[in-house]
């Protein structure tokens, strides 16, 4: 059983010995992993730790300002660096999920490298956890913060040495550590958020319009589902284009957009399918059939209209360790409220869907 006090007692001397009087740049995304790593280091080493949040343009609605406010007392020297236009303009137009993640990684660490030179820091601390490197090593999807574990020499590539104090912990253990370190609950209980952020929730080719659709939709989903404390919940958006097919007697709509999944222990990159289902609790047999046909995510229609360009899918799961997960059976009235507000507030959304796929065969995120 994980004991956060023992963990801090053990890792403290290791960090002090390794880092000495060197400056450390701590990359903070606002998520629980990176923030816990930064606070752990700051508590141990003080002002030698320089926490930095890079605003990539892929953060949630008003996120940079919220993070600054949440952390004002525990990371008072947090620096926010605005790189929105750099990231969006460089990745705009890329449609492959892995290419988007890898381009994000290149831009992110080039930015970090420049900041480290500016602050004369030799070490980079980040919040990589066990689930990140397990997925990357397994080829399921590239986690932008997994470097050393896949043979990338950070000294040679970008001129810094990487420190990852949480690399052997899983999400539930990181949350325990965050509570022990007295992080505000807005951080310790915060929704998991991928390093590339909304980039991987704007499924398929990145456009500025799609990015703003998913930013607004995600905000609505979080507002309604926050009280339920599900393990993870969010929205994704993609173009509504596709075609009807019949697979083993099942009518399905296959979108042109594709999404990641897991088959065995390896990555799958397959179709997103929509089915008509009157009861989201009773779709297992349909999903078992469809995943044989290169389908990674199965969605049910919640609400739709004749106009609009984009589909918005709601994703909510329960999980202990994020290595496997089950989709949540959200009450119908809650889903109805969410879908109604999305259609009301975002004019270019054609339909709202609910993801009824567990992990495996789907990954939690779509990209």
UniProtKB/Swiss-Prot annotation:
ATP-binding in keyword set: yes
Organism field: Saccharolobus solfataricus (strain ATCC 35092 / DSM 1617 / JCM 11322 / P2) (Sulfolobus solfataricus)
PROSITE patterns documented for this protein: GMPS_ATP_PPASE
Protein name: GMP synthase [glutamine-hydrolyzing] subunit B
Top enzyme class: ligase
Coiled coil residues, start to end: none
EC number(s) from the headed UniProt entry: 6.3.5.2
CDD domains per UniProt: GMP_synthase_C
Biological function: Catalyzes the synthesis of GMP from XMP.
The keyword Mitochondrion is annotated on this UniProt entry: no
InterPro entries: GMP_synth_C, GMP_synthase_B, GMPS_ATP_PPase_dom, NAD/GMP_synthase, Rossmann-like_a/b/a_fold
Organism phylogeny: Archaea, Thermoproteota, Thermoprotei, Sulfolobales, Sulfolobaceae
Domain GMPS ATP-PPase: start-end pairs: 2-190
Subunit structure: Heterodimer composed of a glutamine amidotransferase subunit (A) and a GMP-binding subunit (B).
Gene encoding the protein: guaAB
